[in-house]
Every structure is written in structure tokens, then in C-alpha cells.
Amino acid sequence: IMTSDSNFPEHYFNDEIHEECGVFGVFGVENASSLAYYGLHALQHRGQEGCGIVCVDENKNFKRVKGEGLVTEIFNEKNLETLKGDSAIAHVRYPTHGGGGIENVQPFLFRHHTGDFALGHNGNLVNSKELARYLEHKGSLFQSTSDSELLAHLIKKDNNGKHRIHNIVDALNMIEGAFAFLILSDKRLYCARDKYGL
């Protein structure tokens, strides 16, 4: 039983949703964006500020549709038709870090000479300020105010010809907090969860 004199922040006692973000991934399935769309419907209660889907097709082309609002406000038959491919990641946003705005709506899509990839994140990185300072010192330029973008910069900061999975593991070892990440490349879908089991 919770009472108003419990040691909980006041916002726990209002009627608003208190869950934060949701990620959904599909790999190797025909019409992946359709499944991702229905996955977002199932996760809609976890975030209502914005949502997005990134899909990759057989030609290694990444397509993205994202926007601010509910799933049914952002997606329609016409824009879902543009998301062709057999792999996709999707995200619903409830901001815990960074402000509002379309630049913070995920999944993020990153273009790089070693290969493009998309990233979706649920959670909160408690060492985000330190990581942002470190990455800025190394020359990173950020496109959002979301802590989620940090992982992409960490993955690409010291490529040194290593396989992407090694870069991902190295990057994950640098972050602290609660998280679930989906990273979609043209060949693989990587999933990572914090050691506490968010």
C-alpha cells in the first residue's frame, strides 16, 4: 500500500504513465516493418511523445519514418509502404534524458564509411555527462540531446579495423546505468541489456 507520506516522489501518485520508452526488433522476416508497427502498438503505453521505425532492405538501404505523437498519428499505410525489408527496429519515446523535439525521437540512424546502422535505446545512462565530455574532446558532434546517441559514438570512436561486435562490447563496457539497446546493421540485429536486467 502506498500513501502520500511514503518515500516516493510526488509524481508517483498521479494518474499519468510512469514507464519509459520501449524497443522492438524484427530480423529476417518478410515485411518486417508491419510487425514492428504492431510491436509499437503493444508498447505504446511505454512512451507517447514520439515513435519511429528503421528498416533495412536486401540492397542494404536503410529507410526511416519517425515523428512526434502516437503510433497511429505517425504511421499510415503510405509511409509504412516505404519501409521495405526483412529487418527492422522500432522505438516509442518517453523522455528521461534530453528534451523533446524530433531530433530526440528514435531509432537513430547513423551513416558511416564502415557501414550504416540504426540504434534504439530504452533506459537511462547515469554516466552520460562524463561520456559526452569525453566524446566531445575526441571530436564527436551530437545531433540530439538524448543519452542514447552516446553509444553510437562510442561504437565508432576507435574502430581500428575490429569487427563491429567487438566495438559494441567495448562501448557497452563504458556505459553505466539501466538499458536495453537494439542495433541494426545491414546483416545483423544486435541486442544488449544491462547487467541488472532492466
What are these regions, as identified by a protein language model?
Residues 2-198:
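Conserved short alpha-helical segments that host acidic/polar catalytic motifs at enzyme active sites
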